[in-house]
C-alpha cells in the first residue's frame, strides 16, 4: 500500500494556487484508494478548503508539523485529542503563546509584524491570496507568519520557538513541531492496520527536508526558477517538471506505473 505525503505551495499547487496539471493523476490515485496526506505550512482551514475541492479526506499535517488532524474513526486508535470531527495530535505550541512573546518584543521596540497584526485585506495584498483565502491563512492555531522584522527581534524569537525562513516570509512555531515526526507518527498508524506500507514524499524546497527524509521515496519537484533546491537527502529523485506538473510526472513514474518494487 502506498501513502503519499505532499507539500502544497509550488508542489501540488502552482504559483496561482491551482492543481490543474495534477488533476488527472489525483483522480487515478483516488480510484485506487491511495491516501494523499497534505504536509504544509498552511492552516487547518486552508487545508480543509483544498481537501474539499480535491475530494480528499485523509489525515493532514498543518502549520509545519505543529499538529496532525485525523478524521474521527479513520484509525482504530490514535490517542489524539477529540476536537470537532477530528482526533488531533499536537506537536507544537498554541498560537497565543507565540503572540504573547511577539507582543512583548514589540513593546520593547523590536520590529516584528505578522499576520495577527494585519487585516485580511493587507495579507491578500502581500500574498496574492483572495480576501477569503487571506482570512483562512490568518486563522492560525499553532504558528505565526512574519512579514516584516529586524534581525535582533528574530534572534530573540529563536530562543523560545522554531523560526523557519521560507521563500517569502518567516514562519514561527513551537519547538516540538516537526514535519518528519508527524509523518512517522501517521506512518506508524498505517502500519498497525495495513501490510507492506510504502511512503512517498513530495516537496519543492529546503523547508521540506524533514518531510523528504521521513519517507521511503523522497521526490523533489523543480522550482519555478528552473532549478531544484539543493538538499542533502538520500536517494532523492528530481522530478523534471515544476509544481503540479512535476508532481504528476513523479507519481506516474513511482506509483501509477509501479516504479517502486
What are the functions of these language-model segments?
Residues 105-200, 206, 214:
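Conserved acidic, metal-coordinating active-site core of Asp-based
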Residues 1-16, 183, 212:
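Asp-based phosphoryl-transfer active-site loop
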Residues 54-56, 63-64, 159, 214-216, ...:
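Short, structured coil segments at secondary-structure junctions
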Residues 14-34, 94-99, 151-153, 177-190:
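Short, acidic loop-to-helix structural element flanking the phosphoryl-transfer center
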Residues 20-114:
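Active-site phosphate-binding/coordination module
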Residues 57-63, 132-134, 218-223:
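Short hydrophobic/aromatic-enriched beta-strand-loop microsegments
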Residues 2-4, 58, 199:
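The start of beta-strands in P-loop NTPase/AAA+ ATPase cores
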Residues 19, 169-261:
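Mg2+-dependent phosphoryl-transfer enzymes with acidic/Ser/Thr/Gly-rich catalytic loops
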Amino acid at each position: 500500500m502506498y501513502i503519499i505525503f505532499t507539500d502544497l505551495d509550488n508542489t501540488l499547487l502552482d504559483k496561482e494556487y491551482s492543481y490543474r496539471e495534477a488533476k488527472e493523476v489525483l483522480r487515478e490515485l483516488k480510484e485506487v484508494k491511495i491516501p494523499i496526506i497534505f504536509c504544509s505550512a498552511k492552516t487547518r482551514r486552508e487545508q480543509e478548503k483544498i481537501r474539499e475541492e480535491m475530494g480528499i479526506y485523509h489525515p493532514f499535517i498543518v502549520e509545519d508539523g505543529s499538529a496532525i488532524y485525523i478524521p474521527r474513526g479513520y484509525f482504530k486508535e490514535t490517542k489524539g485529542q477529540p476536537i470537532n470531527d477530528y482526533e488531533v495530535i499536537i506537536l507544537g505550541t498554541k498560537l497565543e503563546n507565540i503572540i504573547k512573546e511577539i507582543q512583548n518584543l514589540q513593546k520593547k521596540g523590536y520590529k516584528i509584524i505578522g499576520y495577527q497584526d494585519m487585516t485580511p485585506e493587507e495579507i491578500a495584498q502581500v500574498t496574492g491570496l483572495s480576501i477569503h483565502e487571506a482570512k483562512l491563512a490568518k486563522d492560525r492555531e499553532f504558528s505565526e507568519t512574519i512579514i516584516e522584522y529586524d534581525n535582533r527581534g528574530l534572534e530573540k524569537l529563536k530562543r523560545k520557538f522554531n523560526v523557519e525562513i521560507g521563500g517569502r516570509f518567516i514562519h514561527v512555531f513551537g519547538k516540538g513541531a516537526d514535519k518528519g515526526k508527524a509523518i512517522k507518527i501517521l506512518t506508524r498508524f498505517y502500519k498497525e492496520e495495513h501490510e507492506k506500507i510504502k511512503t512517498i514524499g513530495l516537496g519543492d524546497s529546503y523547508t521540506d527536508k524533514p518531510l523528504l527524509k521521513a519517507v521511503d521515496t523522497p521526490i523533489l519537484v523543480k522550482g519555478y526558477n528552473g532549478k531544484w533546491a539543493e538538499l542533502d537527502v538520500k536517494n532523492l529523485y528530481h522530478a523534471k517538471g515544476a509544481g503540479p506538473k512535476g508532481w504528476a510526472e513523479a507519481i506516474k513514474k513511482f506509483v501509477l506505473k509501479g516504479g517502486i518494487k
